[in-house]
Amino acid sequence: MWPQPHLPPHPMMSEKTRQNKLAEAKKKFTDYRQWNIAGVGTRATDTKKKKINNGTNPETTTSEGCHSPEDTQQNRAQLKEEKKASHQHQEALRREIEAQDHTIRILTCQKTELETALYYSQDAARKFEDGNLGTPSSFNLALSQAFRGSPLGCVSTSLIPGESKDLAGRLHHSWHFAGELQRALSAVSTWHKKADRYIEELTKERDALSLELYRNTITNEELKKKNAELQEKLRLAESEKSEIQLNVKELKRKLERAKFLLPQVQTNTLQEEMWRQEEELREQEKKIRKQEEKMWRQEERLREQEGKMREQEEKMRRQEKRLREQEKELREQEKELREQKKLREQEEQMQEQEEKMWEQEEKMREQEEKMWRQEERLWEQEKQMREQEQKMRDQEERMWEQDERLREKEERMREQEKMWEQVEKMREEKKMQEQEKKTRDQEEKMQEEERIREREKKMREEEETMREQEEKMQKQEENMWEQEEKEWQQQRLPEQKEKLWEQEKMQEQEEKIWEQEEKIRDQEEMWGQEKKMWRQEKMREQEDVETGGEAAGAGEADVGAGGEDAGSGAEDVGPGGEDVGAGREAAGEGGENAGAEEDVAAGGEDAGGEEDAGAGEEDMGPGGEDARGGEDAGAGEEDAGGGGDDAGAGGEDAGAGREDAGAGGEDVGAGREDAGAGGEDVGAGGEDVGAGRRRCGSSRGCRNRRRSCGNTRRCRSRRSGAEDVGPEGEDVGAGREAAGEGGENAGAEDVAAGGEDAGEEEDAGGEDAGAAREDAGAGGDDVGAGREDAGAGGEDVGAGGEDAGAGGEDAGAGGEDAGPGGEDAGAGGEDAGPGGEDAGAGGEDAGPGGEDVGPGGEDVGAGGEDVGAGGDAREGGEDTRSEREDAGEAARARGAVLRALPPSLQSSL
């Protein structure tokens, strides 16, 4: 069925209205086309300008490369304005679409009318050709129906059959004209499709260029941020550099002050610290230079990127010019094709416009999504700003902590300087006393100067070796400090790796320290052997003195069977010339030291068990002070035993049970051995065999460095009151300690009847051959691998200058701190008492009158007379102090080096 025609009011009016409507529709379409193209171009340029301004405008970006809250507010306002403009644009597009729909409906109506007219005209032409026209009335009706609303509607209905040829020609011409119009419409539609494709390609290129511009702006912002961060780092590095320079200046000033006060060793350490800090400054300067080079490179990159941005802008301008030219061409072509447009084109265009409207709506949705994403990015940027602020606060807190640490270090340095000043004052006082004694003893020391010179040579050689070892220790300390700095720089690594790395380094350092300690012990063994020989010579000289019956000192001293002096304090002296009185006495036939670290009662035995020689336990001053057990150990008629018994100069009672004192003032038992305050048995040489939980003194096998016990193989507690006495006067009971005929030490090792060790191996020569292979010489003291003596608490107190303090602290080879007040008790004559007196193993000062009590021929009397078994001077002379001072300086240097180490290394060492 054919569609029914629409009947117009009048044929002439319908033609005019149709033409007017077509002209109006074409005008609207061209205007919309031009407006759409111009709007797209302006929008693209606006977006470009906005993006460029967002990336390069200094008003919207801060100096640090991050957005401020004002910028965020401006961005939000711009987004709102853009949303409003987009809504308005959508409303205008909808109105235009409605108008175009109306025009399309009109054109469709006209199309149907033309199709009906063509149908009737073709039908009439067929009938005319066939000759079946019928009656004239029927032919006229067909023509009137065919040409209603058509351009041929003005034809009269009263047609003659002779005029049918003209009418058929006109119909054929109109039909041919309609075909040409259809072809033109199809060509225009194809051309529009090509133009749309070309426009889409151009829009894609424009979008890609806009994306590149946006990315370049983002990269520029990131580079600006990085530049700002690098500038802040440079400022921080410069501030750190200035602080380090100030610290270096302060250290130089301290060095200049310390040149007049401190010894050479500490000046060397301070100079080395200065060198280290200078090296650190140089390294920091190198780092700063590298950072500056990086900044220059980044600036060059920014310049290159700015050039690229300019080139891209030029490309965009060129493309805009091309688009404008193409738009001009399109306008010209549209002007040519306006006359040829018809219904099919408009239908297709309207369909395309509808599709474009859908696409535009989708684009608007995408733009809204982009706006939401931009808002999310702004929130993320705000979060990043907050995180950066927190990081800056953390860095400030760290800087405050570093300042506090530096202040604490300065306070420690000041305290150390004060301690050194006090020590120097004490040394000056001692030197004054020594000078007074030297004036008295110059005549007697002339004979011993040759021996002393030989010893000085040996001591210098040993000092040189010790200095070399100290230099090695300093190098190791430098390596340790460098390692610690590296560890501070690498704190961001996992903690497990750091722990493993630290453990490996500590093991290596411990191995190095063990090797150095073994070397030091070997040297100390050599020194101990030389000391043994020297003691044997002293013993021989003492035997000569005993046969000669020398006189006692100036302070009404008691003289025993061997002619020994008993001092101003009426101390009791054994048959071997040893001091066994109120405090710091020796208790061996060979004059070995039994009082440097523990208290000894009237019989020469150990009266404390595990007593200390520090500043906080017993008082050893000149005024009748306390000596561990509450007894008085002063200068006149004092008590010296554990039970309050008197030990005077005239052979008074010296035992706990009021026993009789023998020729030497001590209690004499069945085997001619001395009996102490606790009733314990003492051998013929006056050695101690009794109570007191003694412990071993060897440090070779003990890896636990707290000195509670030196030898892990043979350390057993000795319980008092259960000892047996053998045929030779030695103890061979439950405690398994023995005192042999040679007067060996019975507190540190087990000794059998022959004087040798009753442990794993026994030698026939009377020396100690225990598990640690220590040798006990004629003096009875423990002479192990490191030539150290064994005190009451298991500490080392021997020739190596080891520590023997109240807390059982570490006793190394460097003369470390031993007392609760920070005083030393090493081999070099360090301070051990509250009054500044010395109580070491090298013949140091221990009494009120400046007397020596050590094993090397010490002074025990009030007048400075010598009573020791191996004394260098007989009446008022002790060993030369130069050797002791040199050894003390070396020991102090070691102690300073160890104290300079961090607490973690001190605990490990």
Swiss-Prot record:
Residue ranges with Acidic residues bias: 607-620, 757-766
Spans annotated as Disordered: 1-88, 300-362, 381-408, 425-494, 524-909
KW Transcription regulation (keyword) present: no
Biased composition (Pro residues): 1-11
Keyword Metal-binding: no
Start-end of Basic residues biased regions: 692-719
Biased composition (Low complexity): 746-755
Name the record gives this protein: Golgin subfamily A member 6-like protein 2
Organism: Homo sapiens (Human)
